[in-house]
Amino acid sequence: MAIFISVPSYKDPLLTETLCSAYQNAKFKKNLRFCVLDQSEHGIEIDKLVFKDQIIYENVPPVISKGVCWARSRIQEYFENEEYYLQIDSHTIFQENWDEILITYHDWLKAQNNDFVISSYPRAFTCNKTLTEFELDTKFQGTYGMSFKKGDVFKYDIVSIQTAIPTSSSEPLKGHLVAAGFLFSSGNFVKEIPYDPEYYFHGEELAIAVKLFTRGWDVFHIPRTPLFHLYTDVENLPRDLHWNPKDEENRIKKWTELDAISKKKIESLFSGEVDGKFGLGDKRTIKDFGIALGLDFEKKEIVSPDLAFTESRFLKVINESVPFASVLADNK
């Protein structure tokens, strides 16, 4: 039951820590297959890792990078029909037995759902300035749903800023939005919802969500996600961002141009002008997607604040034959 793990990284000093954390905390270590696109000047010492044979590693200069979606798309080219697909960021810490937990979640949900992804903003971790000590936020035991941030709806034309909504649910919830830094699914996701390399940053998650919806896929948020993400203010980041001025000086295609192309592509997606594998599906409509989220994408208006901003949109998942509590009692 192999897991293909997509890890794009941009000059991230936590890349090695992320890889080691995933490997060391996995129950079935031999089933992991990492694919890393390291956008940095010097790269990391892959040969020193005991699991180096399980890593596909590509190191490219930052000046040729075209953004995170370009990186995720390039990584997906190495997918070889693994049973599961895990997409993360390069500043992630894993809980013990995370792989068994995610697969158990997936199999429990699959009993009543065909095509779906498990995704949400993970709980946080913090670290010291030398990146040697880590503190995981394990206090929250509920489920983080995903919604929109008040005041930032349609902030970038069609794109709104997303946020996590803490709920008291101890069981999975059905939602509609995804987090690009944590997405777990069957390997079919790579085949049916491949990443468009022309997306840049803003709109990445919305584009994936609307493609999932219109192609008949569902989204589930899970309790106690077994991995943790580094959330920091830009001023305190221990790494450079893609639009760092120093990198921009030598970059052939500037980030502003990449961002403009991306926004135009996302607008075209919502107007139905994108065909083929990067386009929408025909199982459900954009109008229905908007109704579910409390938004009107055509008019760019909020039609239901409750659906847009609160947990009232989330649906509990019921499996009467196998109660959820019986399958994941150890995930705490």
Report residues per predicted region.
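Non-catalytic, C-terminal membrane-associated alpha-helical segments of glycosyltransferases
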Residues: 272-332
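Catalytic cores of eukaryotic secretory-pathway lumenal/extracellular enzymes that build
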Residues: 2-296
